[in-house]
Amino acid sequence: MIKMNDITRDGNPVLRKRAEKLTFPLDPKYLKVADEMMEYLKNSQDPAIAEKYHLRAGVGLAAPQIGLSIQMASVLVPGPDNTIDLEETLVNPVIVSQSVQIAALEEGEGCLSVDKDVPGYVPRHDRITVRYQTLDGEEKTIKLRDYPAIVCQHEIDHLKGTLFYDHINKENPLDIEDNAILIG
């Protein structure tokens, strides 16, 4: 079970490396890692388990965040009324198209690997199309918008060695395009 002590923190060079592409069939150790990453997300979103193990809530976890420089990320995005908007482990994900429309989270973004609040808007594309492989190697394409799109862009950034605060305007953190959508 992944716990907060297992999360790679900002400053560790693995978070700034471009992750290695995976080949199929996946090594069984990577299948286990994928299960553990999704388990962390589920546990972190369960208030009782999160409190018991002192887990910070997360909606996404990329392999570099647990010290592995491989192109794999798990996302578990809750929807309204206890539904799930997106539950998937993305292997070798690539954003193949994106909207011109920019969006940002009204409250800003956070990250399990960044232990401090970093205020500011993180401009993202409101709609994206992502091509990736499943854990079985099947190629899939998904279209995402709003919050799920932001979550996936955040996780895919981890695979490129980019952290969310790299996108924040350094001179004016609350500066964003006039027509940007604030989600929150």
UniProtKB/Swiss-Prot annotation:
InterPro entries: Peptide_deformylase (IPR023635), Peptide_deformylase_sf (IPR036821). It holds the Pfam family Pep_deformylase. Removes the formyl group from the N-terminal Met of newly synthesized proteins. Requires at least a dipeptide for an efficient rate of reaction. N-terminal L-methionine is a prerequisite for activity but the enzyme has broad specificity at other positions. Fe cation binds at C111, H154, H158. It is an enzyme of class 3 (hydrolase). Its EC number is 3.5.1.88. It comes from the Bacteria. This is Peptide deformylase. The active site is at E155. It catalyses: N-terminal N-formyl-L-methionyl-[peptide] + H2O = N-terminal L-methionyl-[peptide] + formate. One of its GO terms (biological process) is translation. Belongs to the polypeptide deformylase family. Its cofactor is Fe(2+). It comes from Pediococcus pentosaceus (strain ATCC 25745 / CCUG 21536 / LMG 10740 / 183-1w).
